[in-house]
């Protein structure tokens, strides 16, 4: 018989990037007594990955739990970016309600639509938390209207439209139900969760069923499956059957060696858990997302959201440049292979294939951001390698027609830059679907655009909008191929010889275009040192020094004025490289180079 478990609430937090979701979770942790009074706490404790902290994005969903008035509240932090959308869909299967965090100034952002639509489709109740009410330009009343409009657009039910609104400043650690109420702590939010989010339901006497929704990995215990107990009770040393919804033939006898529940930011070992509990299970080496752990007497899989397929791919190659092995700790193909396959333990939207050439691997992911985060992580861990230009993964329909991935791009841009954005996206086969007035002199644009049209566009977009534009994308599906796109119109400036760049050589070179390097930097023949102002590639000698005579002295060099070089970020460099180029990635440096370094061989290959 189904019963409710009143001492547990399972909630997910949904928010746009940088709307204060992780800060809000930190505050709930602090006020529920997870941290000691004198304990030093890192800001945004839920973003455990360095890149997540720096970029203010959440990549992997994380679990935590707080206790309030004898009720355990399991909180799952969801990714706010569509590249990691595969995570979101699975997380929502574990919860009974969501908190939507919205910035009191920026309002409901397009990126939130993707996750919110999924939550509403699953008929989950929503608590709307209007955050950052202490911002001077906050406009909470307008934002409430925007949120309700968004709910209607997404087909919310009448019950969902009756959702409670909580005003908060996560940074100050306060919340209230009415702006005229005194603001003291987060108690109003805690109370709303207990009152509005339903308790999990299930049959504690039925055969056990636990759906694995996310995977964690630990060097000591290996793969850890995380999921909610839907029915029955799960215990340590229990014999179970592992079944997969998409592959019913996959049935395997397993034994539960260790069982954990979440408490604060850590996992606590438990002997058993029953309905509504979110548990972590170790000891099953090939447990995967979408698997159901069942009692042997009823091996029945729980229906599950299929994992989103990758849309773009890059080649990861062992670095073979003249400077190979000088800056990295892990440089061989074995190192690269082990690290990429290790990533598959936790990232289920990723694919890694070995190529015929043992030194290269084809890595496919959900988008440019997805793969750039992997590259940045590997770089920080001491890996040295090279990557090729991102390419989209095409499909074919039953008639053999070529299909390509299409995305919706949601853009907020100052009015004066609208023209240039529409023009640039038009060149990249983007179709303007919607255009409307946003707040504060901004225009909101909505484009349907091929995934390949977005490769390398973000950096260009930021330049065109002087850093004031916001672009978000979500995957739509596959459509017939839209035709060729002309990408980079400018060629590259290529170093002619190996050595150290000098002011005299760079001074001559800067007249040809934009430089990526300054004086005193090591360069090698075939390395790209800048962008040509024209369409062709030019080879330049940036290591040449002026011949000294009685009438010319080296001190005259000091009078040469160099324009500061354009230092490319990882995303900009990935967007810049062409099909005949590679990006050399080391822990210290990013270098763009030609695939064929030798000038004569390069020209010969172009003639073929």
Language-model regions: role of each:
Residues 1-106, 146, 215-218:
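P-loop NTPase switch module centered on the Walker A-proximal segment
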Residues 41-44, 154-165, 200-211, 240, ...:
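Interdomain boundary/hinge elements
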Residues 125, 135-195:
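Canonical P-loop GTPase G-domain recognition
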Residues 169, 355-370:
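Short glycine/threonine-rich beta-strand-turn micro-motifs
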Residues 209-314, 324-326, 422, 490, ...:
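Conserved nucleotide-binding/hydrolysis modules and their immediate coupling elements
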Residues 231-233, 285-286, 365-371, 415-418, ...:
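Helix N-cap motif at beta-to-alpha junctions
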Residues 262, 267-270, 403, 449, ...:
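Long insertion/accessory domains within large nucleic-acid-processing enzymes
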Residues 321-344, 559, 563:
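A short, contiguous, amphipathic alpha-helix enriched in charged residues
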């Amino acid at each position: 018989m189904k019963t409710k478990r009143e001492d547990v609430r399972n909630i997910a937090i949904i928010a746009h990037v940088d709307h204060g979701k992780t800060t809000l979770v930190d505050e709930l942790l602090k006020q529920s007594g997870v941290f000691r009074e004198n304990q030093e706490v890192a800001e945004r404790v839920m973003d455990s990955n360095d890149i997540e902290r720096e970029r203010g994005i959440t990549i992997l969903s994380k679990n935590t739990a707080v206790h309030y008035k004898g009720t355990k509240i399991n909180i799952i932090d969801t990714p706010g970016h569509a590249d990691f959308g595969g995570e979101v869909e699975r997380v929502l299967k574990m919860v009974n309600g969501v908190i939507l965090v919205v910035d009191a100034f920026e309002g409901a952002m397009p990126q939130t639509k993707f996750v919110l639509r999924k939550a509403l489709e699953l008929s989950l109740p929503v608590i709307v938390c209007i955050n950052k009410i202490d911002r001077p330009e906050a406009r909470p009343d307008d934002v409430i209207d925007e949120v309700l409009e968004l709910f209607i657009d997404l087909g919310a039910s009448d019950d969902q439209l009756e959702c409670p609104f909580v005003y908060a400043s996560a940074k100050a650690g306060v919340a209230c139900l009415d702006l005229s109420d005194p603001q003291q702590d987060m108690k109003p939010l805690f109370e709303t969760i207990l009152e509005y989010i339903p308790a999990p339901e299930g049959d504690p006497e039925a055969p056990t069923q636990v759906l694995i929704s996310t995977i964690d990995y630990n060097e000591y215990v290996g793969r850890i499956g995380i999921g909610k107990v839907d029915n029955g009770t799960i215990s340590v040393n229990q014999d179970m059957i592992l079944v997969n919804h998409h592959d019913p033939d996959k049935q395997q006898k397993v034994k539960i060696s260790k069982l954990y529940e979440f408490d604060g930011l850590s996992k606590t070992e438990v002997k058993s858990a029953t309905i509504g509990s979110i548990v972590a299970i170790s000891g099953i080496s090939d447990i995967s997302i979408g698997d159901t752990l069942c009692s042997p007497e009823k091996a029945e899989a729980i229906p599950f959201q299929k994992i989103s397929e990758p849309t773009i791919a890059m080649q990861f190659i062992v670095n073979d440049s003249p400077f190979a092995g000088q800056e990295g700790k892990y440089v061989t193909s074995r190192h690269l292979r082990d690290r990429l396959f290790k990533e598959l333990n936790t990232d289920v939207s990723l694919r890694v294939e070995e190529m015929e050439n043992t030194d290269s691997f084809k890595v496919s992911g959900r988008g440019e951001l997805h793969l750039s985060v992997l590259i940045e992580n590997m770089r920080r861990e001491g890996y040295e390698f090279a990557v090729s230009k991102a390419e989209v993964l095409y499909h074919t329909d039953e008639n053999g027609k070529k299909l390509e991935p299409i995305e919706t791009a949601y853009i907020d841009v100052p009015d004066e830059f609208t023209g240039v954005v529409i023009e640039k996206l038009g060149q990249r086969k983007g179709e303007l679907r919607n255009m409307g007035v946003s707040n504060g002199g901004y225009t909101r644009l909505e484009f349907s655009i091929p995934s390949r049209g977005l490769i390398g566009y973000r950096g260009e977009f930021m330049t065109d909008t002087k850093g004031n534009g916001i672009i978000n994308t979500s995957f739509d599906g596959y459509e017939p191929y839209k035709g060729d796109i002309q990408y980079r119109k400018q060629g590259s400036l290529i170093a002619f010889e190996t050595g150290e760049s000098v002011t005299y050589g760079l001074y001559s070179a800067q007249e040809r275009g934009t430089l990526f390097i300054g004086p005193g930097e090591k360069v090698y023949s075939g390395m790209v040192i800048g962008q040509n102002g024209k369409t062709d590639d030019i080879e330049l000698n940036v290591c040449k020094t002026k011949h000294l005579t009685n009438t010319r002295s080296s001190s005259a060099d000091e009078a040469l004025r160099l324009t500061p070089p354009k230092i490319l970020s990882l995303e900009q460099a990935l967007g810049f490289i062409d099909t005949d180029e590679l990006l050399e990635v080391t822990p210290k440096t990013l270098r763009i180079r030609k695939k064929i370094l030798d000038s004569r061989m390069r020209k010969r290959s172009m003639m073929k």
